[in-house]
Amino acid sequence: MTKNHILGLDIAQNSAVTQLDRADGTKCWRGTLPTSQAGWQQLEKILAEHGARLPDTLVLLEATGVYHLPWAERLHQAGAEVYVLNPLLAARLQSAANALREHKTDSVDVHRVCEIGRLYAAELARFRYQPEPARQGLKQLDHARRKLRATLTNLKKSVQSHLELVFPALLKAKIGPCTARASAILEKAPTAGAWRALPEAERQKLAGVKQADLDQACADTLADEALAQACAPAVHALLSAQQALAEQLRRCDAQIAPRLPRERVALITSLPGFGERTAAVMATYLPASFEGWGPRKKIVPRVQALFGLDPRLRQSGKWTGKVKISKRGIGAGRTALFQAAFCSLSHDEEMAAYYALLRTGDGRGRRSKTHKEAMVDVMRKQVRRLVAVLCANQPYGKKSHKAA
């Protein structure tokens, strides 16, 4: 259907700079709307004043964190054809008027968005907005989990750093500072002096096979007892926060599990190297209908690009730059693919042999690759296997997926 108007929105937390153009590029209106019901009602009034109906309007938004989602949902429900553009695309498709000056204002941005819609509407199909509340909720949970995981990792590092001052003997005895054994010891005796003051039987109960090592480390330590006692409350505070965050992470995992597409997760975990966690990430970020993107040979490069594994070419005349992965896609998926590729080297003889071949060269003039280059190739091979398994809807088997 031919659209009569183009509506562009550059959305921030509390406002949306909006421009309405006719299909030929003539500007009808530009202004700022609040991100509220009042802003929506004002938009409806403006559209009516200029004879624009949302079903006959091409709407383009620039993806801005999560701020664009309420607008995209409301516009979609009102019958508009909504496209959510990658900010990098919007930034690089400069308008002719601003290409040399490179001004950066909200008005310039929203004008550029409208111009993209006018010039490239036929090529924007992959940016068409489709409401998927359940999938978006799963993405938000995964994002929350990654934040919790990162915070927990930083807390564990902080605990170890504090123990270097308070109870270095615990680390010297090779007792993991984040283990249940360390927690029990620190609860009863947070310093070397407090440990030596405990009865032999209690020390044996707390440290087990590590008692002798810890006793010796406490005897050899240079830590000042008064200073250690003064700083011990900081260790207890960090340990309490660590335990609370670990429990919160477990609850987050429990919320994610029932929301995952179990059949897809089962297929992905059949691949060597993929576990429950990495399979969950891939199932979360792979579009539900990606199998319909075309033949498998076309799907694979598109999935690679989705996770930023596609090569970024740099050539000009006789000069050839170093080819690197683009890293433009979904970072969480790329991390999961790296973890799966790394694990596959230990659990899949075929993949280990493939990695070894990449590192040594094939003996026919093809150069050997560095570890990083070889790992990227292994990640791409995992993508080929992933696509083969999901498109065939069958668990992985060497005989049935030789093409991967």
Residue ranges and their predicted role:
Residues M1-A404:
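A detector of single, family-specific signature residues
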